[in-house]
Amino acid sequence: MWGICIPAVCSSTAVSKLTKVMYESATLSSIPSDVTVKHCQEAGERTPYSTGFYIFIVLVLSLIATAVGSTYYRKHVPAAEQSTNYLIKIITKSFCMNNNQEDLTKVNKDEIHVLNGIRFLTSAIVISMHVIFYMSVAGISNLLDVDEFLEGVGGLLLHFDLFVDTFFTMSGLLHIKSLMKRRQSLLGVLWKRYIRLIGPFALIVFYLISVSKHYSPGPAWIGVDETDICEKHWVKSLLMMNSDVRHICHAVTWYLPCDYQLTILGTLLFFFYQRNRSFGFVSYAIVAAFSIVIPGTLTYLYQFPGVLFSEYGKYVIRYRDTWEISLIYTPFYSRASTYLVGVAMGYFMCIYKPNDYRKSVSKKWSIIGVAVSFIIMAATMSLGYVFKQRQYDPVEAVVVAATNRIFWAAAICCIIGMCEYGNVPIVSEILNWPVFTPLSRLSYGIYMIHPIIVQRHKLAQRSPHTFDTFCMVYDGFAILTMSIGLSYAMWLFVEAPLINITNQLFFDKSKEKEPNKSRNENGQGHQNGVTKNNVSLNKIELYKRNYENRIQHQNGVPKTKIL
């Protein structure tokens, strides 16, 4: 990125010519350049506050006030004196911060504890990757150091997108596990999943449209066009229908429609399984085959590299202008194989419940299984570096594109399985650390919030960034810490209340009619002309008399009752 300060009276044509001269002289380049001016930021220029800005501020303050008021009301007002109004009960119960705090730390029955550690650690890694991503978008001054890094150990990170496949694997596992746990409305399941995703997403979209332009100065931010894209395509994004990278509101949110569409696919497969077990398995096999064939076919037809980001500069720096991403990276069919591996693991864990088969795999084989999984993950991750060093081979590209995500997902599932069914000393203890339980539940908020922090930090600078490992690690930890704090606030004021309200309105089992107790208590139900209560009492008395008087013999010796 290059910046130049000139008098405000200069036209865009003049700016283009001056920038061209500056670029060619600074880089000592003889390559002809063509500079396009998208925006000139004028000193002292301020964007007027819109109505949406004030609505956003009022909305946030209202949510906070409602949460504080509900917490005080439920804590200090005696239950006998609390209002019986149904709406007030729902609001105060849903927004009570004490209840939401307990939900954040509560350990659920049959919870797969290792998933908490995997989910949070994956979120932390994704944040680190996005720090580098937005640095590249904003501009790096020492690009030779970047090239040297990618030629060395950094080349292992060229397939960094595999970390996102960990989320899809866990999503498939948990979704099928939830469906098989109890009988429930499948449409209700999809609705709950949508509500779970939409709350934080809608608030972030509202922020990007109405507020971000006032707090994100700098030419780099203007060039990202987040605000304009959100204003044009926010409806499609909120409906989980947007997988086109040119129209995605907030770059990292491509994950949401992809995940939700896969949730619909998983629910449909489960519906087939409910109707006919064999047809369900056949449907799963067909979809799994297509999830392998489609990425491989597209890679062959369009001659994509086996690992898309092995050509880092082409597919990252100008990601919105790269049509290949919308065809092979963000659509649900490109991640279906990973999701289906998770579905298979979830089905296995429902049939063979970990609580019933704990430590059934020996320590030796558990360690071997985890070690092999880590080796497979490292080998799969290194494919980006391998493809960067080799000439393009269409057969290799097709095979890798079709199968590499499956190996990654299978390795993740193997680690989960060995920790749940076996005995893995260090890995299991780390992933089962209790601190990961609340952090895992904040991971969705962390994922949604952290790009805003990274953008504000990286794109507000008016000079190119310096690529330095220590600085990136420092930025990663700082952004992770801020994201956790803001995600905690998002949970208390937005995410948990919205989930609670939905459960109260649509899935509250306490609203179901209770059986008529007076009927049973008064003995009005008759059976063959005799009240049911009398029949039950007669049976109990008869059983007691038989038990007291009977003498059981074994081998001719009476068996006495031991008191």
Region annotations inferred by a language model:
Residues 59-104, 391, 420, 424-436, ...:
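C-terminal "closing" transmembrane helix and its immediate cytosolic amphipathic cap
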Residues 78-107, 135-156, 201-258, 293-327, ...:
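Membrane-interface helix-loop-helix regions
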Residues 46-61, 110-116, 151-164, 224-232, ...:
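Interfacial loop-to-helix transition and helix-capping segments at the boundaries
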